[in-house]
């Protein structure tokens, strides 16, 4: 069976690279990248392409290692070398791509076993995001008022939305009668073949990310005002108004959509200009979770609010913040053991 598949050709892969005994591991990674392109989302492909073409291929091409000769020690040397320049989390992503590619090589009988199975994956770095207090959130929303970041900041702070979810919000997801806000569309940016591409997708990160949240009065009022402002701008600009993004909440005065990189670049500048503590835009999501925890909201409800795929994700990220519940548990133990209502 192995011999029969030696010259197996994948129609969607680069024609100049043949899958045979002489194929370099670096060339095989490029072949796999093309094969997998049609089965993954464009943003995922962009991530894969960056890692494969900029990091994995140059390293292994320089060493001239054939796919059939690749050993676990070769991969371990690669991981160790990368750990000198990037964090463990990046190397974990490299490993994931290499493992998937080699699994495919086993599947089509180019190699008998997957050498990546024998390599110790680096331990993931423990990340603890920064969090704003309620007072800091109030200050931030005030300074963002009237800027292009006002709506993104408001929605990310209150609902804990991801950047892609905020920018992907459309008016048809807002029900002003039922007072609900539906998270079902995203806008992201990807780099494909060296070009930045805006990706608009009618789906969120996972099935659990598709969620409906209550539209609270203060935000309802602000969105109604925004809707009126956009209609006015559209009338005033006439044909000059960009109609490519009609329906989106986060557009500027002439209809241009607010792009992900704009938010990431301008948000820290807004903080610095106004003397606020530096955090990432994504930390507004963490700030939302920390405020919910501080006000006694159970972790399970926070999971649903944030749209995490499983409870463990929420627990792993925010368990160290759940001090309020620990105090409640301590008080319950004091009372249970007959120590009275002593404050813990």
List each language-model region with its residue ranges.
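Proline-centered turn/helix-capping motifs that create local helix->coil transitions or kinks
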Residues: 105-115, 176, 185-192, 223-240, ...
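C-terminal secondary-structure termini that scaffold catalytic or DNA-interacting sites
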Residues: 178, 189-210, 217-219, 225, ...
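Short functional hotspots where side chains directly engage DNA or cofactors
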Residues: 66, 117-118, 178-184, 280, ...
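Short, basic (Lys/Arg/His-rich) helix/loop patches that form interaction surfaces
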Residues: 142, 146-149, 159, 213, ...
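DNA/chromatin major-groove-contacting recognition/catalytic segments
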Residues: 138-145, 192-199, 295, 316, ...
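N-terminal core-binding DNA-recognition domain of tyrosine site-specific recombinases/integrases
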Residues: 21, 33-110, 126, 257-262, ...
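Basic, Lys/Arg- and aromatic-enriched nucleic-acid-binding interface segment
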Residues: 88, 92, 107, 111-113, ...
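N-terminal DNA-binding module of tyrosine recombinases/phage integrases
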Residues: 1-73, 226-245, 323, 344
């Amino acid at each position: 069976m192995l011999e029969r598949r030696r010259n197996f050709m994948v129609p969607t892969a680069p024609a100049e690279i043949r899958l045979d005994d002489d194929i370099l591991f670096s060339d095989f990674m490029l072949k796999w990248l093309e094969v997998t392109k049609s089965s993954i989302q464009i943003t995922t492909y962009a991530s894969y392409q960056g890692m494969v073409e900029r990091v994995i291929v140059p390293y292994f091409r320089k060493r001239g290692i054939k796919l059939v000769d690749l050993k676990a020690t070769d991969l371990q040397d690669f991981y160790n070398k990368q750990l000198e320049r990037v964090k463990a989390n990046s190397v974990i992503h490299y490993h994931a791509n290499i493992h998937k590619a080699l699994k495919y090589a086993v599947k089509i009988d180019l190699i008998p076993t997957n050498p990546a199975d024998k390599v110790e994956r680096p331990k993931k770095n423990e990340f603890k995001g920064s969090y704003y207090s309620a007072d800091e959130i109030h200050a931030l929303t005030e300074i963002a008022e009237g800027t292009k970041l006002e709506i993104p900041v408001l929605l990310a702070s209150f609902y804990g939305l991801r950047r892609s979810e905020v920018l992907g919000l459309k008016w048809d997801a807002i029900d002003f009668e039922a007072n609900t806000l539906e998270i079902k569309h995203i806008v992201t940016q990807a780099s494909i073949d060296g070009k930045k591409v805006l990706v608009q997708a009618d789906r969120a990160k996972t099935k659990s990310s598709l969620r409906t949240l209550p539209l609270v009065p203060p935000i309802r009022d602000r969105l109604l005002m925004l809707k009126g402002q956009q209609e006015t701008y559209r009338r005033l600009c006439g044909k000059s108004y960009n109609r490519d993004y009609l329906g989106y909440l986060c557009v500027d005065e002439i209809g241009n959509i607010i792009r992900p990189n704009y938010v990431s670049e301008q948000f820290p500048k807004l903080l610095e200009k106004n003397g606020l503590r530096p955090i990432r835009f994504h930390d507004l999501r963490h700030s939302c979770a920390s405020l919910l925890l501080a006000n006694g909201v159970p972790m399970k409800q926070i999971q649903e609010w944030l749209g995490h795929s499983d409870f463990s994700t929420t627990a792993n990220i925010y368990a160290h913040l759940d001090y309020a519940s620990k105090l409640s548990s301590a008080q319950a133990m004091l009372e249970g053991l007959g120590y009275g209502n002593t404050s813990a």
